[in-house]
Amino acid sequence: IGEIAISDHRSSCPSTAELIRLVEHARVGGMLGGKAGIANMHMGDARDPFRPIYDAVENSELKLTQFFPTHCNRNPYIFEDAKAYGKKGYVDLTASSYPYDPENEIKPSKAIVELLSAGVPLEHITLTSDGNGSLPNFDREGRLISMDMGLPKSIMSVMIDTVTEENLPLETAVAVVTSNVASILRLRDKGRIEPGKDADIVILDKDYAISDLISRGQMMTRNYERL
């Protein structure tokens, strides 16, 4: 379920009891339906941003892995907290918001490297585009003064930047946007190239441009041309 906004002035500010009940419902629904039953959490700019999740876990039988917090690179202090949180729970970084707010946002490719250096398991790190999501800009009084939109293509740009600028192996960068996401969300037919799974394949040239693309076994792009 989700996204559920917490630690954000735009959220409905769910109480600990409400959050527990909501995520417990997601868990039970996942068990009955053979799905992950995970709760995607929109993380806001409030201080101590993970506190609502910690409180829910401390007052229930829920585990940190039942929560999937996103926008964890939106400012320096949430990112620092994510380094500790990510050792036991999952951490999702947002690709499309940088360089929209470069004074606050942590560059997502750099964030991947820093999380790994801090001891966060690779399998706990994901990157999503938040494509078509809103990128609001507020003044000091909290008034909305402008609005932009995240782009789906940002995820590809960040993945390439992780390899070319941050010098991570391609297989590491690819895992953050493929197999890690599929494993956490239990998307059994996604995230890997194996017999019996959906044949979703992106082929890149030496300059990391998409030359060919296959979706569920169907050729969608061949020799740089969309079919």
Annotated model-derived regions:
Residues 1-4, 64:
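Acidic, His- and aromatic-enriched active-site or binding-groove loops in soluble protein domains
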Residues 100-101, 179, 212:
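Short secondary-structure capping/turn micro-motifs that flank functional sites
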Residues 117-204:
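His/Asp/Glu-enriched, well-ordered alpha-helical/loop segment
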Residues 51, 183, 211:
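Alpha-helical elements of the RecA-like P-loop NTPase motor core of helicases
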